[in-house]
Amino acid sequence: MVLSTTVCRRIRRKAPCAFLKRTLKQKKPRLSLEKRCDLLIHLNCLLFVQKLAEESRTNACESKSGVIKKDHVQAAAKVILKKSRG
């Protein structure tokens, strides 16, 4: 069970609330934010990274590559961003 304790140390259990709020205030100072919007932003980011990983893995499998390369991730990012626009 040593593996599980080392993995738990690397994974953050909470969203970086202060960092997200500070970054949003720097970029958009007049934007009014609700109380827990930082959690929604963090969740959205995690979902994007998960979709990116899945899509890049399928791109790597289609090109018969055992390793996910930079090109696979860039192609996956284009597809995911195009889907998210609507």
UniProtKB/Swiss-Prot annotation:
Subunit and interaction comment: Heterodimer with CENPT; this dimer coassembles with CENPS-CENPX heterodimers at centromeres to form the tetrameric CENP-T-W-S-X complex, which is a subcomplex of the large constitutive centromere-associated network (CCAN, also known as the interphase centromere complex or ICEN). Interacts with NPM1.
Name it.
Centromere protein W
Grouped into one coarse class, the protein's main location is nucleus
| Keywords associated with the record | Cell cycle, Cell division, Centromere, Chromosome, DNA-binding, Kinetochore, Mitosis, Nucleus, Tumor suppressor
Q: Which domain of life is it from?
A: Eukaryota
Q: Which GO terms describe its cellular component?
A: chromosome, centromeric region; inner kinetochore; kinetochore; nuclear matrix; nucleolus; nucleoplasm
Q: Name one GO biological process term.
A: chromosome segregation
Coiled coil (residue ranges): none
Query: Gene name, please?
Result: Cenpw
Q: What does this protein do?
A: Component of the CENPA-NAC (nucleosome-associated) complex, a complex that plays a central role in assembly of kinetochore proteins, mitotic progression and chromosome segregation. The CENPA-NAC complex recruits the CENPA-CAD (nucleosome distal) complex and may be involved in incorporation of newly synthesized CENPA into centromeres. Part of a nucleosome-associated complex that binds specifically to histone H3-containing nucleosomes at the centromere, as opposed to nucleosomes containing CENPA.
* InterPro entries registered for this protein in UniProt: CENP-W, CENP-W/WIP1, Histone-fold
Q: Which family does it belong to?
A: Belongs to the CENP-W/WIP1 family.
In which compartments does the protein localize?
Nucleus; Chromosome, Centromere; Chromosome, Centromere, Kinetochore; Nucleus matrix
According to the UniProt entry, its GO molecular function terms are: DNA binding; protein heterodimerization activity
Per the UniProt entry, what species is this protein from, by scientific name?
Answer: Rattus norvegicus (Rat)
